[in-house]
């Protein structure tokens, strides 16, 4: 056996459970977040494991036993890969529901996890539904907290929230389409939150299904070593079961809904393929696991248990993903995935969770999942229920009891836990207490998404979730006079969803809502109509432009106002310059020598800078990547005050901005279009018409995927054009990439339009 096979590259995994992208970072021109930086930035999983092992020493046998039974699992995938159908089968086989219902509500019931009418009609998952269920494996009972997440790009925040509090995930991939654009996005999110995953290749009963092509794509596109632990028995419509490669046994689903598992000998015609794929599994594991590598070099045949242990180690180390296969709709191959969740994904004691000690200069603290420790929990999702605000909480340390008082670390407010529930989609079951590692929900707690709660004895804060900036806005006006329901709905949606923003434009007297895409905003307008009986008229979708500068400009501005009695006086001198590092956002600095401007006036200058950046001088959009330095100035003994310096700063900024070769920046989107091969020419023509830059083309045997970069301003109405060009068979996804300067003629048009609007006022 060739020793060269073992020349693998050492793993460089991002350590820690908390994302290595700092949450205060500006993402491709997004505005800064007032979130904590990442509490953990370790370079290797090995270092992380040392800390996890140290923490395990502090756990009692009861804690270890309780954690061993727990799995916090998310289900993520590209839209229409069959996540919700898969979850429906999981709930049925774990006896949480008594009958299977299909997505899109075809049987007038709809999938259990799609609890909103809108979800059942559109056949897409909008919110992450949380539920828990039990699974028996080899005589032991395991408790799963299960979260079904949306696959549509516009609902990315729901996926982010789910992954932030989970310990592992099932990545569902379509056997026909393979790795798609949103699969790549979900993979990036899993890496950001260091979530290990088991992969399930779904829709094996569909024509054109090819699981091994999908596995190749996992390796090449997602850059994660992946190998099959099963192969299918039969293909497409003749799919009848799977072969377990590790145990060399065939698994069949019998009964009306596949609830009975039968094991038998492997069909003779599949034995050569089974041995080939089993060997490939061992070789792939040898590349990522040291113990398996030694056995491989010594040419020893690993036992079944040794293979399972190697898969578990490398999956938890996030250096490998085992691949299972089946069809949720055909009730085939789901129970082995539940066994794989138990066998290969971590329990809460095997994951490092870190907080910041606010009382000790934000020092990092490793949380211990023991019930005797002080309580620490994260509110990761809010919902408005019929009994008031429902807050989803992940307990990281200690226990949460009904009737206990808990403290919001951010606000310092103490609140009583009046009711504690476990969620089953939109239904709930009351419980008296939950221990560390569990996910629960509570009522009557006023907080924001991402707030940390403790029992008051410690002041720990969890790092918050990364929130992408909104890229599409539209004006919205209620038809009815029911203003109270309109504002109630907007307030609720904002609290529930950090990517949904609302502002009132005093000039146009319109309410502007902003979000992640057209569908995102459409869903909220529709929810307003259904849940609050508020019909709205919406304007045309608007692009969220940004304004910036390209060269430095000095300023020396004096603000004077005399109106009898005390007047106003403030003078500021300095420089306005572009920020080269887009991760820093807008920067305000002072370098005043000798106290020529007192600190309280400088603070007012800072406020003026923040305010003027919200509405740029060119077209009234937010300013991006600009640094303002005030290094001199003057005050008047009587007339100077905070307002004078705030006004002087704002006027100086506007004046210097217009002299610094300003540019208007527009959002550039990553576009992925998938369509049958016969429409390839039409789709390329359509993208060329939009002046898109085509980056990559992938041709499958019956469909192709085009990846391109395109200005968002040209993409409105693209769904309709694509439907027309592909006879309704094409699909696409959009994701924000970066901001780039608009073409000079577009900039001229935008400025001219803005000036006309201003002149009318």
From Swiss-Prot:
Name of the protein described by the UniProt record: Elongation factor G, mitochondrial
Compartments, as annotated in UniProt: Mitochondrion
Post-translational modification: The precursor is processed in two steps involving mitochondrial intermediate peptidase (MIP) and mitochondrial processing peptidase (MPP).
Transmembrane region(s): none
Protein family according to the UniProt entry: Belongs to the TRAFAC class translation factor GTPase superfamily. Classic translation factor GTPase family. EF-G/EF-2 subfamily.
Keywords recorded for this protein, A-Z: Elongation factor, GTP-binding, Mitochondrion, Nucleotide-binding, Protein biosynthesis, Transit peptide
Keyword Nucleus: no
Protein's organism: Saccharomyces cerevisiae (strain ATCC 204508 / S288c) (Baker's yeast)
Any single Gene Ontology cellular-component annotation: cytosol
Targeting presequence: 1-42
């Amino acid at each position: 056996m060739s020793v060269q096979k073992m020349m693998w590259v050492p793993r460089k995994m991002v350590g820690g459970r908390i994302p290595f992208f700092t949450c205060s970072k500006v993402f491709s021109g997004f505005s800064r977040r007032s979130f904590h930086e990442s509490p953990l930035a370790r370079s290797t999983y090995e270092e992380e494991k040392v800390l996890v092992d140290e923490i395990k020493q502090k756990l009692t046998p009861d804690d270890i036993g309780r954690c061993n039974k727990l799995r916090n699992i998310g289900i993520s995938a590209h839209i229409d890969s069959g996540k919700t159908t898969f979850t429906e089968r999981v709930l049925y086989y774990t006896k949480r529901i008594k009958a299977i219902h299909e997505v899109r509500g075809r049987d007038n019931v709809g999938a259990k996890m799609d609890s909103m009418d809108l979800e059942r009609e559109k056949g897409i998952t909008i919110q992450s539904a949380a539920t828990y269920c039990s699974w028996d494996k080899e005589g032991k009972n395991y408790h799963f907290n299960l979260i079904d997440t949306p696959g549509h790009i516009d609902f990315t925040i729901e996926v982010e929230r789910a992954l932030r509090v989970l310990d592992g995930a099932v990545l569902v991939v379509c056997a026909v389409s393979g790795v798609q654009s949103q699969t790549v996005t979900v993979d990036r999110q899993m890496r950001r939150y260091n979530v290990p995953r088991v992969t399930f290749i779904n829709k094996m009963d569909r024509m054109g299904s090819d699981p091994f092509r999908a596995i190749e794509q996992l390796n090449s596109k997602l850059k994660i070593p992946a190998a099959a632990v099963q192969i299918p028995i039969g293909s497409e419509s003749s799919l009848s079961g799977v072969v377990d490669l590790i145990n060399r046994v065939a698994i069949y689903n019998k009964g009306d809904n596949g609830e009975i598992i039968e094991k038998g000998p492997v069909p003779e015609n599949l034995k050569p393929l089974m041995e080939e794929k089993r060997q490939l599994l061992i070789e792939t594991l040898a590349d990522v696991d040291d113990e398996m590598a030694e056995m491989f070099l010594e040419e020893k045949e690993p036992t079944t248990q040794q293979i399972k242990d190697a898969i578990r180690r490398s999956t938890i180390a996030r250096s490998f993903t085992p691949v299972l296969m089946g069809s949720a709709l055909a009730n085939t191959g789901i129970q082995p995935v539940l066994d794989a969740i138990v066998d290969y994904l971590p329990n809460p004691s095997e994951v490092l969770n870190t907080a910041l000690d606010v009382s000790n200069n934000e020092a990092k603290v490793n949380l211990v999942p023991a019930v005797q420790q002080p309580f620490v929990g994260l509110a990761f999702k809010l919902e408005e229920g019929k009994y008031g605000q429902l807050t989803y909480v992940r307990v990281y340390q200690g226990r949460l009891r009904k009737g206990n008082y808990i403290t919001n670390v951010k606000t310092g407010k103490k609140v009583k836990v009046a009711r504690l529930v476990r969620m089953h989609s939109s239904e709930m079951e009351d419980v008296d207490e939950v221990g560390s590692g569990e996910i629960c929900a509570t009522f009557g707690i006023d907080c924001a998404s991402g707030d940390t709660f403790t029992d008051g004895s410690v002041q720990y804060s969890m790092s918050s979730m990364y929130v992408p900036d909104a890229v599409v806005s539209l004006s919205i006006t209620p038809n009815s006079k029911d203003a109270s329901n309109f504002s109630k709905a907007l307030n609720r949606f904002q609290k529930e969803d950090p990517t949904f923003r609302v502002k009132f434009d005093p000039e146009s007297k319109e309410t502007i809502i902003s979000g992640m895409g057209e569908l995102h905003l459409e869903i909220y307008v529709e929810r307003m109509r259904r849940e609050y009986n508020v019909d709205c008229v919406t304007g045309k979708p608007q692009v969220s432009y940004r304004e910036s500068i390209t060269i430095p400009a000095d300023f020396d501005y004096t603000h004077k106002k005399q109106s009898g009695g005390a007047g106003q006086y403030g003078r500021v001198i300095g420089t306005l310059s572009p920020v080269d590092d887009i991760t820093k956002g807008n920067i305000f600095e002072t370098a005043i020598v000798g106290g020529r401007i007192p600190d309280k006036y400088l603070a007012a200058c800072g406020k003026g800078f923040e305010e003027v950046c919200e509405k740029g001088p060119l077209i009234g959009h937010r300013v991006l990547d600009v640094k303002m330095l005030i290094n001199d100035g003057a005050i008047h003994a009587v007339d100077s005050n905070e307002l004078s310096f705030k006004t002087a700063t704002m006027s100086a900024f506007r004046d210097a901005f217009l002299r610094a070769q300003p540019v208007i920046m527009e959002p550039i989107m990553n576009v992925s279009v998938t369509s049958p091969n016969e429409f390839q020419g039409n789709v390329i023509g359509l993208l060329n018409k939009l002046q898109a830059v085509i980056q990559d083309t992938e041709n499958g045997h019956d469909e192709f995927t085009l990846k391109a970069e395109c200005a968002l301003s040209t993409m409105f109405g693209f769904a309709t054009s694509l439907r027309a060009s592909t006879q309704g068979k094409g699909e696409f996804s959009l994701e924000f990439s970066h901001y780039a300067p608009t073409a000079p003629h577009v900039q001229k048009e935008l400025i001219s339009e803005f000036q006309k609007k201003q002149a009318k006022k």
